[in-house]
Amino acid sequence: MSKILIRAMVLPMTGPEDFYPEGEIGIENDRILFVGEKGSAPDSFIPDQIIDLPEDVVMPGLINTHTHAAMTMLRSYADDLPLMPWLQTKIWPFEDKMSDEDIYWGTLLALGEMIQSGTTTMLDMYASMDQVAKAVLEAGTRGVLSRGLIGNAPNGERAFAENMDLVKNYHGAGQGRIQVMFGPHAPYTCSGEFLQRVKQEADRLGVGIHIHVAETEDEIKTIKEQYGKTPVQWLEELGLFGGHVVAAHCVHLTEEDQEIMAQNKVFIAHNPESNMKLNSGTAPIPELRSRGVVVGLGTDGTSSNNNLDMFGEMRSAAFQQKLVKGATALPAYEVLQMATVDGARTLGLHDVGVLAPGYKADLISINFDQPHFYPRFSIPAHLVYVAHAGDVRTVMVDGKILMQERQLMTIDIKRVCREVEKRAKGIAQGL
């Protein structure tokens, strides 16, 4: 058994007023035993290791609720294009040439970047997900994995079978660090019959569904022309909602769509930087939250972002809403909730996202002893409006240190970078 005592400023994300300027966190193996002010450790707690971080803020690890990790292979390959030309002329042709090994190395690069920027959990959608699982297990992070399913593609049935195998082989793997969902790509790439089969199998196997919904105006137009309804209305008619569904983007929603989301308890993965870069639009996040919809935060893939920095994503989420809705829209603490506790709820993870007794020891420390963090009137405001990836000092998942003093402990990042550079350039040259 391993016992660790961390001394630091602690933001547990258990409530807006909860903050310990001189705090302590006790960890036993993979779980948090106690969180509180200095001196709150019980006499019976004798740590094997003490980590003193007096100038750091320790908070829950960040949760990326929508990404395509291996798309690090395509970073800066296709920029400054709208979604459909971007997908059809650049992204899909490149992805067709990617091997299983390419996806493994691309994912490992993404996980290194995530750890260095304070992300401990991701919801991923891609192909060759056994390779993604392999990378997650090696890196030591937490991952909810879904095989991307384009039902209308020639390999749609094979991909469907691969998603079922993914559930069988990896759901609960890594002492529970890996969970699995089904990943139908979008309403415009899957037939109604295909989506109903996905729903049936997801219910049978007891897993969730991860799908892109209402990302662009073109999608709305296409689905209305085909079915006479918005994508959200059509998916409800099909019966896709009702279980655990994570809908990514949800930029273009009518009032009726928003009410459907609320009534069916659909979870939203909000990706503001990708939505801005691809000119998809501004999602109605304050309106959804006011209806009780749980909204998490995601980066999308690095080919449409172009990084995996959740601190930057938080800042963009706040600023985009303030530009469109007013200065009081989406305050800092609410954005932090989206990146932590509400991210955990979005992924169906009930023991991460806050620092509290019984929860998993998934946490990060941010070095606040830097000029841009003074004066310290508001810790949440600094985390959302000031902090960036390079401020993260320590990362822990399941009580294991994955990064210490910015040094990755589980990934040879220089080797990974060289491998990805070689592989990505090789694919691009062949197109």
UniProtKB/Swiss-Prot annotation:
Entry GO MF terms: 5'-methylthioadenosine deaminase activity; metal ion binding; S-adenosylhomocysteine deaminase activity
Domain of life from the UniProt record: Bacteria
Cofactor binding summary note: Binds 1 zinc ion per subunit.
First and last residue of the signal peptide: none
Disulphide bonds in the chain: none
UniProt EC number: 3.5.4.28, 3.5.4.31
Keywords: Hydrolase, Metal-binding, Zinc
Substrates-to-products reaction catalysed: S-adenosyl-L-homocysteine + H2O + H(+) = S-inosyl-L-homocysteine + NH4(+); S-methyl-5'-thioadenosine + H2O + H(+) = S-methyl-5'-thioinosine + NH4(+)
Residues that bind Zn(2+): H66, H68, H212, D300
UniProt-listed InterPro entries: Amidohydro-rel (IPR006680), Deaminase_MtaD/DadD (IPR023512), Metal-dep_hydrolase_composite (IPR011059), Metal_Hydrolase (IPR032466), MTA/SAH_deaminase (IPR050287)
Residues at which substrate binds: E95, R147, H185, E215, D300
Gene3D superfamilies (UniProt xref): Metal-dependent hydrolases, Urease, subunit C, domain 1
Cofactor: Zn(2+)
PANTHER family attached to this UniProt entry: AMIDOHYDROLASE-RELATED DOMAIN-CONTAINING PROTEIN, AMINOHYDROLASE SSNA-RELATED
Job of this protein: Catalyzes the deamination of 5-methylthioadenosine and S-adenosyl-L-homocysteine into 5-methylthioinosine and S-inosyl-L-homocysteine, respectively. Is also able to deaminate adenosine.
Similarity field: Belongs to the metallo-dependent hydrolases superfamily. MTA/SAH deaminase family.
Entry protein name: 5-methylthioadenosine/S-adenosylhomocysteine deaminase
Species assigned in the record: Desulfitobacterium hafniense (strain DSM 10664 / DCB-2)
Organism classification: Bacteria, Bacillati, Bacillota, Clostridia, Eubacteriales
